[in-house]
């Protein structure tokens, strides 16, 4: 039977590019299952998780249509909770907030092991994600800025080293993306968000800890 790999947008394609050949992959918040199906067709074993049952059914249909349902294990649950330590080498989280990504990582202590690769694309607050990864002993290995649906996103590739550090504001803002395609647009977008965030801080409207940007009074 002829199979057809699902089309991936720029964000998911960049995530897929960081997955190691033949890896055991956890696709957290797998949603429609397109990334899981594509990776399975490329030779990976995939565990897809989602906190809601409906997206898992959509993912199941996607994988069946692609002819790879036998290589994708879909599990209902929050974040990495449905997995046991040792079941995944590469962990993908895309389309969720930085705070949610950090919550998921904090709840799964087994991810703090050398050799596990994190592939992360936060929907919001990438500077916060960079900072908190460094504080938790993870090191950024590479980044890819992409444009999807008219917005610039950055896909981070990171691994655990155990060396906790406090990155400076410049690193939090641009990370390893300074010389990459779309870097200029990324800087412009980041500068605009920084300006708005500083204005919110000055007005006392910043309600979320860590919700500011480097240089803001609330950046803690």
Specify the residue positions occupied by each region the protein language model found.
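S-adenosyl-L-methionine
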Residues: 1-22, 37, 57-85
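Conserved SAM-binding loop of SAM-dependent methyltransferases across substrates and taxa
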Residues: 32-44
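Conserved SAM-binding motif I beta-strand of class I
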Residues: 45-50
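Conserved SAM/SAH-binding beta-strand->alpha-helix loop
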Residues: 52-54
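Short SAM/SAH-binding signature in class I
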Residues: 88-95
């Amino acid at each position: 039977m002829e199979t057809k790999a699902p089309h991936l947008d720029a964000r998911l394609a960049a995530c897929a590019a960081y997955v190691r050949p033949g890896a055991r992959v956890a696709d957290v918040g797998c949603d429609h299952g397109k990334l899981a199906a594509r990776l399975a067709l490329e030779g990976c074993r995939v565990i897809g998780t989602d906190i809601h049952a409906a997206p898992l059914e959509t993912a199941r249909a996607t994988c069946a249509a692609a002819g790879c349902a036998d290589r994708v294990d879909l599990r209902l649950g929050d974040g990495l909770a449905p997995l046991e330590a040792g079941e995944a080498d590469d962990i993908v989280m895309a389309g969720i907030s930085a705070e949610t990504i950090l919550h998921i990582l904090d709840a799964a202590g087994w991810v703090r092991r050398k050799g596990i690769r994190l592939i992360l694309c936060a929907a919001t607050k990438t500077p916060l994600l960079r900072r908190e990864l460094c504080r938790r002993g993870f090191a950024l290995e590479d980044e890819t800025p992409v444009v999807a649906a008219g917005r610039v996103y950055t896909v981070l590739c990171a691994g655990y080293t155990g060396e906790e550090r406090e990155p400076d504001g410049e690193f939090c803002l641009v990370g390893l993306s300074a010389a990459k395609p779309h870097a200029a647009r990324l800087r412009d977008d980041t500068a605009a968000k920084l300006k708005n965030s500083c204005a919110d801080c000055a007005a006392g409207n910043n309600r979320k800890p860590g919700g500011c940007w480097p240089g803001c009074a609330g950046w803690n």
